[in-house]
Amino acid sequence: MIKDIIQNAEEKMKKTISVLKSDLSTMKAGRANPTMLDRIHVEYYGSMCPLSQVANVSAPEPRVLMITPWEKPLLKEIEKAILKSDLGLNPSSDGSIIRLVIPELTEETRKTLVKNVKKTGEEAKVAIRSIRKTANDKIKALKKDEDLSEDQVKKAEDEVQKKTDAVVKEIDSIIAAKEKEVLSV
């Protein structure tokens, strides 16, 4: 039963890491990355669809994204969705494709981006600590229900703490790498 609790906590921690990586990949760092557009949804026959389901997004150059809609009438809808987004990008269309030029980041923008990266990392750490607390609470509840010894409880809590420390260390390295990417000119 203790193994199940620890395994469950570990799976949740891994999921938190993948969410963090996903969130960071959508933050622009002065380079074109198709995942920047993952949060953009386009109206398609009355329903909102992710851009990736109605168009092909590629990065032919380091600072250019190219969007090729699968249906030409979607061109205007995609342009509208990009303009409405918080990305601050201006689409230019030639009638069949949309090009997005990613502007160079200013020093001020880089600093703001680094703050957002750190904030996102801190939110991930808070989520990890919450997972640890939940796991430890379940272990303590097992102590009462299944008559576990103090040593068994302490050993299980130590294992949860080791896993937590490893994941927090991984988060720190992910954040440091993203900061380096943002600050490199």
Swiss-Prot record:
Keywords: Cytoplasm, Protein biosynthesis. GO terms for cellular component: cytoplasm. It comes from the Bacteria. Its main location: cytoplasm. InterPro entries: Ribosome_recyc_fac, Ribosome_recyc_fac_dom, RRF_sf. It is found in: Cytoplasm. GO terms for biological process: translational termination. One of its GO terms (molecular function) is ribosomal large subunit binding. Belongs to the RRF family. Responsible for the release of ribosomes from messenger RNA at the termination of protein biosynthesis. May increase the efficiency of translation by recycling ribosomes from one round of translation to another. This is Ribosome-recycling factor. It comes from Clostridium beijerinckii (strain ATCC 51743 / NCIMB 8052) (Clostridium acetobutylicum). The lineage of its organism: Bacteria, Bacillati, Bacillota, Clostridia, Eubacteriales.
